């Protein structure tokens, strides 16, 4: 027999940004516990609302199945002595099983005969064990900072108020997190019934919706919010900004979603849209509305948690709440524009970037110099890049950015435009932080790219230079910064070398007295290794296999664009018919050469070539060496590897017909030189011996 099973945990308000994670983890943990207990079912569905987590299990078995447990003992040969008496090992095993040796059965396998004990284990009723299973599932939730409440020692993410566990219509007796199970379910705080009883698991969640005015189905609430917000925006001729993270957060904040539209005064549209949007989304959890051409409308959409008979009062209330915040943004914008960005530069002397690395003004000076250096390398406007570097952090000293921190960069752009700075300079102030996250847009031009790379490299080299490389945590976001630099270089194809960039960045930490702010003598090597390590993570995410990435990293290419070409070339080579054989041959060659202690000449001695197979291979290697020079010079590694694939037959013939480690020392050394030259052709691209089958 099987029944519906329900568990609902009623709590105080759960953290909205963690609600989905908690619910999904609860379901996954409980399903794993059911599997471990060998309880069959047809599925587990999770429910989550601001004040509850719930699971409903379809067709959960009411009883564990009976089963036969086998316990194998010692081999018969070890269980009895020469006189046929049971050994101590056999007697001890039998005692542990609660039987005598004579009562043991025998089991014959291809490895011999063994003593065996079979025991029938009766399955337990689900009602007797499900409380413990649920408690274990809850104990395994990802809760960083659990709370205690009252005088209890129990801990959970928020205080627990109610617990309901039903198997069909039967109440499961038990206690979890200090709360005893009963049939009482709490409804909405302001609508429906505050409390009511539930008779069976099948009634959930519909009874909660009907009587308690709580929509427990998270995905259903989210779907309503999305659909109604889109309709509301369309009704005023706009498009709602329904960013998924914000939609998720709002879904986690409401039990009964009611979507409403409000407005604000058009005069606020004179303020940069980013500042208004920051207020609406960040502070108030409102959805901005745009025209089709991305112009902000004087409206916003919000989600109420109550169904009011007079929604206009709810709308007016939200308009009153947001108006002072928008007025603040307007005031800050107007006040900030009374001073030019460049006039705020001296103020950066009073802001510490990092105690050992100096002020933000010190960082600005380094960014300015490094941005100019990079701009020269990539063909961008050097003076504009240096100007953008000089102004890059000035908006940190504005009232707007101080109050609305997420507007840094974008406000710098608006203020720079107001000050009459060149457009490329203004844009660079916003784009210096790009890419902000995986998949984010890159800076749109060379000036922006130069400043963005300079800012990130200064931070990376500086933090590594004072011995604070990231371990587990990464407080300075150096992994993200490194990936940002690599993406800009690779995706724009800039011919930049990390060795040069890091060395230049390091040099800028020199102080007037000739000393450096940096104390780590190995900073250059550590930074380059760290950044090369970011390649592995990035290219794995792009779908390249680990062995391909490692084959290229083995050659330690420090030009990111060059690394990219190598990885793509090796990936293409791997699909060729000859790839597996040549990878194996390279591995064999590497092993042979590793055992040789002597020195090898650069060129082979043609007079010492005796076998036809080695003559053919030598000729092919010589021809290939000359033919591939243009491809290597231009970084056309795919063409080079495609040609090297033609060496499969002469390489196979060589190993089939030539004794490399000949008794004649001269012959042996000459053949090793030939193999070394062969391997070096491949090593100019990657160590293909690392490729797996």
Swiss-Prot record:
The UniProt keyword set, sorted, is: Aminoacyl-tRNA synthetase, ATP-binding, Cytoplasm, Ligase, Nucleotide-binding, Protein biosynthesis
| GO terms for biological process, alphabetical | arginyl-tRNA aminoacylation; glycyl-tRNA aminoacylation
Q: Does the keyword Ribonucleoprotein apply?
A: no
Q: Which domain of life is it from?
A: Bacteria
GO molecular function terms noted in the UniProt entry: arginine-tRNA ligase activity; ATP binding; glycine-tRNA ligase activity
Write out the annotated subcellular location: Cytoplasm
> What InterPro entries does its record include?
DALR_anticod-bd, Gly-tRNA-synth_bsu, Gly-tRNA-synth_heterodimer
Q: Which HAMAP family match?
A: Gly_tRNA_synth_beta
User: Which NCBIfam families does the entry mention?
Assistant: glyS
**Family as reported in the entry's similarity comment:** Belongs to the class-II aminoacyl-tRNA synthetase family.
**Assembly behavior:** Tetramer of two alpha and two beta subunits.
Instruction: Tell me the protein's name.
Output: Glycine--tRNA ligase beta subunit
Organism encoding this protein: Vibrio vulnificus (strain CMCP6)
**Which gene is transcribed and translated to give this protein?**
glyS
């Amino acid at each position: 027999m099987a029944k519906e099973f329900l568990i609902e945990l009623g709590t105080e308000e759960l953290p909205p940004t963690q609600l989905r994670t908690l619910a999904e983890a609860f379901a996954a943990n409980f399903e794993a516990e059911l599997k471990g207990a060998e309880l069959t079912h047809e599925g587990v569905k999770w429910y989550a609302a601001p004040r509850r987590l719930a699971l409903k299990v379809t067709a959960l078995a009411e009883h564990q199945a009976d089963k036969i447990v086998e316990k194998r003992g010692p081999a018969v040969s070890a269980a009895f002595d020469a006189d046929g008496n049971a050994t101590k090992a056999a007697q001890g095993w039998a005692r542990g099983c609660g039987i005598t040796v004579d009562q043991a059965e025998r089991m014959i396998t291809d490895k011999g005969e063994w003593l065996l004990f079979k025991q029938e284990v009766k399955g337990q009723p689900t009602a007797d064990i499900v409380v413990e299973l649920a408690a274990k599932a809850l104990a395994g939730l990802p809760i960083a900072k659990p709370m205690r409440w009252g005088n209890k020692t129990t801990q959970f993410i928020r205080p627990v108020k109610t617990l309901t566990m039903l198997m069909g219509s039967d109440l499961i007796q038990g206690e979890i997190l200090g709360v005893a199970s009963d049939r009482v379910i709490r409804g909405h705080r302001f609508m429906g019934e505050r409390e009511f009883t539930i008779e069976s698991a099948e009634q959930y969640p519909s009874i909660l919706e009907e009587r308690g005015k709580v929509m427990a189905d998270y995905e259903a609430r989210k779907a309503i919010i999305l659909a109604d917000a889109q309709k509301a925006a369309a009704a005023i001729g706009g498009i709602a900004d329904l960013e998924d993270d914000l939609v998720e957060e709002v879904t986690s904040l409401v039990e009964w979603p009611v979507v409403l539209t409000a407005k604000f005064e058009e005069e606020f549209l004179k303020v940069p849209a980013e500042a208004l949007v920051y207020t609406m989304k960040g502070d108030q959890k409102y959805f901005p509305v745009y025209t089709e051409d991305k112009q902000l409308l004087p409206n916003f959409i919000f989600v109420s948690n109550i169904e009011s008979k007079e929604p206009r009062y709810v709308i007016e209330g939200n308009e009153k709440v947001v108006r002072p915040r928008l007025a603040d943004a307007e005031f800050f914008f107007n006040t900030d524009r009374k001073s030019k960005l460049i006039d705020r530069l001296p103020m950066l002397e009073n802001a510490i970037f990092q105690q050992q690395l100096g002020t933000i003004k010190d960082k600005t000076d380094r960014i300015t110099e490094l941005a100019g250096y990079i701009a020269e390398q990539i063909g961008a406007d050097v003076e504009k890049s240096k100007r953008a570097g000089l102004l890059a952090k000035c908006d940190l000293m504005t009232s707007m950015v101080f109050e609305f921190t997420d507007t840094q960069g974008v406000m710098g752009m608006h203020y720079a435009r107001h000050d009459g700075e060149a457009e490329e300079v203004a844009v660079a102030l916003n784009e210096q932080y790009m890419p902000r996250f995986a998949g984010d847009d890159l800076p749109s031009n060379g000036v922006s790219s130069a400043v963005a790379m300079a800012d990130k490299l200064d931070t990376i080299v500086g933090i590594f230079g004072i011995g604070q490389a990231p371990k587990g945590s990464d407080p300075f976001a150096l992994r993200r910064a490194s990936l940002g630099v690599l993406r800009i270089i690779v995706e724009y194809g800039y011919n930049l070398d990390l060795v040069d960039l890091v060395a230049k960045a390091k040099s800028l930490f020199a102080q007037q007295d000739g000393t450096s702010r940096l104390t780590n003598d190995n900073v250059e090597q550590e930074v380059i290794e760290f950044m090369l390590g970011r390649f592995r993570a990035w290219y794995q995410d792009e779908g390249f296999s680990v062995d391909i990435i490692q084959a290229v990293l083995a050659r330690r290419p420090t030009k990111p664009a060059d690394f990219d070409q190598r990885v793509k070339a090796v990936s293409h080579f791997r699909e060729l018919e000859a790839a597996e054989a040549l990878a194996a041959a390279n591995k064999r060659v590497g092993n042979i050469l590793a055992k040789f202690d002597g020195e090898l000449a650069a060129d082979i001695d043609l007079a010492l070539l005796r076998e036809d197979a080695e003559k053919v291979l030598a000729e092919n290697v010589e021809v290939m060496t000359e033919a591939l020079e243009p491809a290597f010079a231009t970084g056309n590694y795919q063409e080079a590897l495609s040609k090297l694939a033609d060496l499969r037959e002469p390489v196979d013939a060589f190993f089939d017909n030539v004794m490399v480690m000949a008794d004649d020392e001269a012959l042996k050394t000459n053949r090793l030189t030939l193999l070394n030259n062969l391997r070096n052709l491949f090593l100019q691209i990657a160590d293909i011996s690392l490729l797996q089958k």
